[in-house]
Amino acid sequence: MKVVTFGELMVRLQPFNYERFVQANNLEFSFGGGEANVAVSLANYGLDAAFVTKLPAHAIGQAAVNSLRRYGVDTSMITRGGDRVGIYYNEKGASQRGSVCIYDRANSAIQLAQPSDFDWDKIFEGVDWFHFTGITPALGQNVVEICLEACKAAKAHGVKISCDLNYRGKLWTREQARAAMTELCQYVDVCISNEEDAKDVFGIEAEATDIYGGKLNAEGYKSVAKQLADKFHFEKVAITLRESHSAFDNGWSAMLYDVASNEYCFSKKYDLHIIDRVGGGDSFGGGLIYSLLTGKSTQEAVEFAVAASALKHSIEGDYNMMTVAEVEKLAGGDGSGRIQR
């Protein structure tokens, strides 16, 4: 099975030891980005995963490419050119202080990319699945056009398409997001959202839910999933459910709605003590794609995806370093965290 993901791979700069930006003297250097994170997860699970983007040909661009190669991601379809690698600064939250993300992505290679930079017919030869997120079209209208061309080509090649809505208010307005994502979602088969994105992008929300007070009405998300599926004719809708008690402690679960069977499956809920939550949603997406490609049932798929994401919250950095066996062990009920000897 081969999966292609498309998006921006950025430099991640982060203060050490939960320091704030204003007190930090040093920053930790790594790489990450929503769709790249999904590709790493899938490569770790043994699938043929390729990441498509545009990166400069200089040393930082090459370091970004190498960060994917080391985990087995196919980087052969990355276009090289431009001058900048996008940057995001991440200040990790602690206790009641939430994390802060500051973007420095203007004029990055992918933000300035043009549709002619990518040969989607060639890229989708022999591909089974295509994944992108709502973060990528938020980079500009030219990138919306690239995403549209990718989706049209994927459909022409019989490729399944998944999209994580991933609304980012620092990149575009709700009105801009709704216009672009309404057009793009017409091509999507599997939609991934969270407790906020459906409301932010499409104005669809669950009743009796207070995301900031840690109160979620899980049953209300059946209606959210149904409305999304009806609007865009999705085959499946997954919604992750995060109960945020503090920066360290979250409740984490998800629901997967299968339209054909009219089946709503809820995962077990995990009580997380978080090491790093960045990439948590991407690891859910990677787990879900893996599950659907390998024939898991709706219940098995949502359990695997949530377990994969729960484990990612214990790992520093954007990328999820877990194996299929480790995820299946947790999904099967072993969450003791006991030492392996």
Which residue ranges define each predicted feature?
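Beta-barrel outer-membrane channel/assembly domains of diderm bacteria
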Residues: 9-15, 37-44
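Alpha-helix C-terminal capping segments
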Residues: 30, 38-48, 291-294
